[in-house]
Amino acid sequence: MNSILSTFKPDASGKPPKQVPYIPWLKLNDGNEIPMLAYGLGTANYKTGGAGFDEKIVDNTVMAIKAGYRHLDGAEVYGNEEELGAAIKKSGVPREKLYVVAKIAGNKKQDTEEAFARTLKKMGLDYVDLYLIHAPFFADSDEELQQKWADFEAIKESGRARSIGVSNFLQSHLEVILTTAKIPPAINQIEFHPHLQHGDLLEFHRKNNIAVAAYAPLTPITSDVESPVRTIWSNLSKKYGVSESVIGLRWCLDQGLVTVTTSSKEERLTSYLNHLPAIKLTPREVSEIAEAGKSKHVRGFWKNKFEPETRAK
């Protein structure tokens, strides 16, 4: 599959703590590279419709950038593209040092070019590093999904999106667009954690050289499920001298997955940057967590669209 070719050191203009070590990058199938740890603008930073400009979201994002995060994962449906753009400007870090992700809403029909132009305007940017179809659920036919992907190919060819990809796609959705695609998706961002491992989907990605990004990786901690994974994470946290959250994120990274996390707490964000590069789980530990996770199925997002189809995965 894709391979880690380089490392990322937080730029001095962002004034990160001196002790922040390197974060790896992953080479995508289009030749571009993506930082493997992302700061997400969803969940805690999600803004409900009609809410005004939120300075707290700006401050949270600036904090993440100054801590050393360069991969910023945004989306139209998060409702905070203006705040993301403001944070980029306020951070003082040059645009070219940042990796900005945007997503078109995947649950409604809209003109792709108009939606993308609106996103760029809200963020005050000329381009994004990665543009994703947030979900396939807007499409009533294979042809509609294929046309949306053709729209994305045109945006990439225009230079306004360095890479293009999808999110929340199952193998069946990927097969539809690959049938007609001139440019394959660079990445598929999916909910991924020990309690939702998607069966053979990761192997399909490897065979087709499509990278995977994991969101909600800490579900065993953040959900109310009694997770057997927690016992393993607790034991490993003591072994490696890090938090359970670091173990959970490391489990994804050690499988070659780009990993999206978020927090409004600077200490937690800095801890991830400090500790994640310092440890590596053994193959046996990765496998042990995976097997424990399979004992319970938990999906936190898009339940009404996926269940019960993926309950066993």
Regions found by a protein language model. Name each.
Residues 1-97, 219:
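N-terminal binding-site loop/beta-alpha segment at the start of enzyme catalytic domains
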Residues 69, 125-128, 161, 185:
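A structural motif
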Residues 22, 135-313:
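Beta/alpha (TIM)-barrel catalytic core signal, keyed to glycine-rich beta->alpha loops juxtaposed to Asp/Glu
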